[in-house]
Design a protein with these regions (language model features):
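Short, basic phosphate-binding NTP loop
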Residues: 2-120, 129-140, 162
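Phosphate-binding loop of NTP-binding sites
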Residues: 8, 95, 101-220
């Protein structure tokens, strides 16, 4: 199970020793945080997760990732500080340079700890149904992790990977594409050994620019 020291290893490159505690789950919505979970404060179009850090702690979260100073009733550990003074006990926040990048780094680190097959699925249409079908077939014989719903982007895929446990034998991950470079980012995080492209169409052409750009992006 993910722990505080794992988070430090992912973000700093090393553990600090001393205090450690398990993190049961990860969430970006303070209303959905689990007891002893990890809350990642992200900047959204309508609101800012940093406004709800203390709400997440009140719900039972043990740790939060933030990327700018906030008013909080709980300690804040600045990871850029020369002398890191870890609080005596949770809950508290970790101040990072970018909370989204911190989530992605943590997910990539956590994925690297597991020697399992990862299947990445993308395509203009049909990727969700292909993911569900593939996961359903594999789950008959193997303990399978898959994205829930459409958690297939730079936020949802990392959150999915943080659910990996020693019991999982394969992961089936849907990967969404909106702009060039996005599939590469998701692959750098998940490191799939098998890739499936369902098809290439003009979906999201208004963002990508052309079907040629979409085809190139899907091939990343």
């Amino acid at each position: 199970m993910l722990s505080f020291q794992h988070v430090l290893k992912a973000l700093l490159g090393h553990e600090l020793g001393g205090l450690d505690f398990r993190l049961t789950d990860a969430a970006i919505d303070s209303r959905l945080v689990s007891e002893s979970g990890l809350f990642i404060a992200l900047h959204g179009d309508r609101t800012d997760g940093h406004l709800y850090v203390d709400d997440a702690f009140a719900k039972g979260a043990s740790l939060a990732l933030i990327d700018h100073p906030i008013k909080s009733a709980y300690p804040i550990l600045d990871l850029n500080s020369v002398e890191l003074q870890i609080p005596d006990k949770p809950p508290f926040s970790l101040l990072t340079d970018n909370s989204l990048l911190a989530l992605q780094k943590l997910a990539a680190y956590w994925r690297s700890r597991f020697d399992i097959k990862v299947i990445g699925i993308t395509g203009s249409v049909g990727k969700s149904s292909t993911k569900e079908l593939t996961a359903n077939v594999l789950s008959k014989r193997l303990v399978t992790l898959k994205n829930a719903g459409n958690m297939n982007n730079e936020i949802g895929l990392p959150l999915t990977l943080l659910k990996l446990t020693d019991e999982h034998e394969v992961a089936v991950l849907e990967m969404g594409f909106y702009v060039p470079g996005e599939i590469k980012l998701l692959c750098d995080i998940a490191h799939p050994q098998i890739g499936i492209i369902t098809n290439v169409g003009t979906v999201h052409a208004e963002r990508a620019g052309s079907i040629e750009v979409i085809a190139e992006g899907k091939s990343e």
